[in-house]
């Protein structure tokens, strides 16, 4: 009986992994650094307009954009394309380090809100996504900094300045929590 349950669980896990791999394969041409972290979250660099309808067809409910107007992107156009695809649009403009408390709180609130899931989180290159995801994993989910940094790097965190900003934010806020 236990072995049948184990086999069923393994089959379900494999089916989920195959589903996520299929989504990644379908979107990789339209979305740089597209990565399905799990059933509820995907991360990416700047998506092409065509990606939003594909996300919706795979059951995504929202897109969280961390880009700013100062980057020369048309945020209004992106919002229009996302909403046209039937997705909820969230923008938390993140500029240069350091990470700001209001931005981190808004990020964590958006990520934790179940009505936003599944959610794709993006910026220009996935650097900021990785930095904010790292902070979320450590401060909200209780992950170790090493594990969080590993996942942030996989997402796209390559900037030494953003890595340091995330580590500094974590250090400052871990001390406050103690």
Which residues make up each language-model segment?
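Bacterial N-terminal signal peptides
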Residues: 1-9
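Cys-dependent protein tyrosine phosphatase-like superfamily
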Residues: 10-119, 134-178
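A phosphate-binding catalytic loop at a beta-strand-loop-alpha-helix junction
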Residues: 119-130
């Amino acid at each position: 009986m236990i072995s049948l349950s184990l086999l069923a669980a393994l089959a379900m896990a494999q089916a989920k992994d195959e589903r996520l791999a299929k989504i990644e394969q379908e979107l990789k041409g339209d979305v740089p650094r597209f990565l399905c972290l799990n059933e509820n979250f995907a991360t990416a660099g700047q998506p092409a307009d065509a990606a939003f309808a594909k996300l919706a067809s795979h059951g995504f409910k929202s897109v969280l954009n961390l880009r700013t107007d100062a980057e020369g992107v048309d945020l209004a156009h992106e919002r229009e394309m996302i909403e046209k695809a039937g997705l909820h649009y969230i923008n938390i403009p993140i500029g240069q380090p350091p990470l700001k408390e209001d931005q981190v709180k808004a990020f964590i609130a958006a990520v934790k809100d179940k009505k936003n899931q599944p959610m794709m989180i993006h910026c220009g290159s996935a650097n900021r996504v990785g930095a904010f995801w790292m902070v979320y994993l450590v401060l909200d989910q209780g992950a170790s900094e090493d594990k969080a940094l590993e996942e942030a790097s996989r997402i796209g965190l390559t900037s030494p300045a953003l890595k340091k900003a995330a580590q500094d934010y974590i250090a400052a806020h871990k001390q406050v929590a103690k």
